[in-house]
Design a protein with these regions (language model features):
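A short, structured beta-strand-centered segment in the mid-to-C-terminal lobe
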Residues: 55-70
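Short, contiguous alpha-helical
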Residues: 6-53, 89-157, 161-172
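Exposed alpha-helical structural elements
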Residues: 33-34, 62, 73
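Proline-centered turn/helix-capping motifs that create local helix->coil transitions or kinks
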Residues: 42, 76-86
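Residues that form generic nucleotide/phosphate-binding pockets
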Residues: 37, 66, 77
Length: 172
């Protein structure tokens, strides 16, 4: 993630109103929401996953420190609580009552999908070869989307500008 140039962090991504900075935050906010729910019984809501940047993340170092803190927190949780937890227990989240296994799985593939997007952005938009390449075997057993970008056409466009473009070639 540190390979994204600081000058590009606030550039808006193709096809959606989110910057590189917001995407990086979102990647780590997803497991933070999971951990907060698991450890503190904080409600697991759609709004919590909107990943609105907090004011405390003033610069890139704050963002990278946040990411490292979440990574270490997750590793500690897994070592101390997670690996022995009964993930078949029910979890009540914004999309219904599911098992903790399903919530953890969704956390993994959701953040993983956004990591795939960062890798694609580095290569295709920033012309940077990622120092660490994501191997698809990392996601073995996870229900990863087939497309890295939700709409491959939108990825080839310029940054999202908030305007809906009509395709005049489609007639009713």
């Amino acid at each position: 993630l540190k390979q994204i140039p600081v000058s590009k962090l606030d550039v808006i991504l193709p096809g959606r109103p989110r910057s590189y900075r917001q995407l990086i935050y979102h990647i780590f906010n997803i497991p933070e929401v999971f951990l907060n729910y698991f450890q503190n019984n904080t409600p697991y809501t759609y709004e919590a996953l909107l990943s609105i940047l907090p004011n405390k993340l003033k610069d890139e170092n704050d963002l990278y420190d946040y990411a490292e803190d979440i990574k270490l927190r997750f590793e500690s949780w897994w070592s101390n609580e997670g690996k022995n937890f009964d993930f078949s227990k029910p979890a009540n989240v914004y999309y219904g009552e599911v098992s903790f296994h399903e919530v953890l799985e969704r956390t993994a593939w959701h953040s993983g999908q956004h990591c795939r997007q960062v890798e694609l952005l580095l290569k295709e938009k920033l012309n940077i070869i990622p120092k660490i390449a994501l191997n698809e075997s990392l996601f073995y057993g996870l229900p990863m989307p087939s497309n890295i970008w939700d709409n491959e056409r939108s990825f080839s466009e310029n940054s999202y500008d908030g305007q809906v473009k009509e395709d005049l070639s489609i007639k009713e």
